[in-house]
Design a protein with these regions (language model features):
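Flexible, glycine-rich surface segments
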Residues: 162-246
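Extracytoplasmic/secreted cell-surface and envelope-processing proteins
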Residues: 58-62, 111-114, 194-198, 257-260, ...
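Von Willebrand factor type A / integrin I
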Residues: 21-23, 212-310
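Bacterial Sec-dependent N-terminal signal peptides
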Residues: 1-39
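Charged, often glycine-rich, active-site loop that binds/positions anionic groups
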Residues: 108-130, 295-307
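Von Willebrand factor
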Residues: 43-122, 126-180, 184-186, 193
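Scaffold/interface architecture of coatomer-like assemblies
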Residues: 103-107, 126-141, 195, 202-212
Length: 310
């Protein structure tokens, strides 16, 4: 029966050739409209965490983007993450399903409504409770609920910043890393780090980086990289031995007034992740979600050691 269920899932849903999950306005049902790639059923258990930066980077008035507002790009990235999580689960043997997807905001929101939305985005499947309907609700939930979250944050207009540094110091091991899983952390951020309660400086290392800091450090002119290396600039290491964590950074949005800005952000993040022993990471600029679909798919659905051993 279990084999039959899994077989039906693959036959029915890999034939879909559309692009999103949408609700049917005439009923409680929804129509599933995106394609599932055909993957090996022998796949690692996935534990995917997403850390959202709800600072003023998402403010469409302060940072307008005619092609697509940055908060809508985030929503598109979240939808793509959910779609690939669905594809991963759909392709696994039912008896081996044990996979998780969750979203975090740091600092934790005081708004109970927002906490309820975050809780709704905490999804897990195992062989005892997985159903076709629950799997296929994932991208719809992520699309609709994340849109409401971003719109509420913009309407509230109280951007306290995102404490990315402290999350990686105090919470990432407890919240995002579990034994027996392939642990992935996706960070949606413009690449700058700042929170009013986490401002520390150790020699030329900091727990923050803003466009003003880049300019103040002299990283807006030729020779910036030599200075960066000689003085040992960078982020203060927030943790050590995160070798069981893979990190995908999406949404880098450098200040266009400095031609070196993107390179500076990339060097800061790369050095930081390497020093924390993150072995697999990618850092991607803010692009349209349609252009990022393959990047996200390749990172989440890549062939793993478990598959190679089968």
């Amino acid at each position: 029966m279990k084999k039959h269920f899994h077989y039906l899932l693959l036959i029915v849903f890999t034939s879909s050739v559309f692009n999103s999950c949408i609700e049917d306005p005439k009923s409680d049902k929804f129509v599933h409209h995106h394609e599932f790639p055909n993957l090996s059923p022998n796949r690692d258990n996935l534990n995917i965490s997403v850390l959202l930066d709800l600072s003023d980077r998402i403010n469409p008035e302060k940072y307008p983007s005619p092609a697509m507002e940055f908060y809508l790009r985030d929503v598109g990235y979240l939808r793509s993450i959910a779609e690939n999580f669905e594809a991963h689960v759909i392709n696994k043997k039912m008896i081996k399903i044990d996979d998780k997807l969750q979203v975090f905001i740091d600092p934790e929101p005081s708004d109970n409504t927002l906490n309820t939305k975050l809780n709704a985005l905490k999804i897990s499947f195992d062989k005892s409770d997985v159903t076709k309907k629950r799997i296929l609700e994932t991208c719809r939930k992520y699309d609709s609920i994340s849109t409401l979250m971003y719109e509420a944050a913009i309407k509230d207009d109280d951007y306290v910043g995102s404490d990315t540094w402290r999350f990686l110091k105090n919470k990432v091991k407890d919240y995002c890393i579990e034994e027996g899983y392939r642990n992935i952390l996706v960070i949606l951020t413009d690449g700058y780090i700042f929170h009013k309660n986490t401002k520390m400086k150790e020699d030329y290392r900091t727990t923050y980086l803003t466009p003003q800091d880049v300019k103040r450090f002299g990283f807006n002119k030729p020779g910036w990289k030599e200075k960066f290396e000689q003085k040992d600039y960078g982020f203060v290491a927030a943790n050590e031995n995160l070798s069981d964590l893979e990190v995908l950074v999406l949404g880098i949005n450098p200040d266009i007034k400095n031609p070196y800005e993107e390179d500076v952000i990339r060097v800061y993040w790369s050095k930081w992740l390497e020093e924390m022993q993150v072995k697999n990471f990618e850092i991607k600029q803010a692009d349209l979600p349609s252009n990022m679909e393959k990047v996200i798919q390749d990172f989440i659905l890549k062939k793993t050691r478990y598959q190679e051993e089968q």
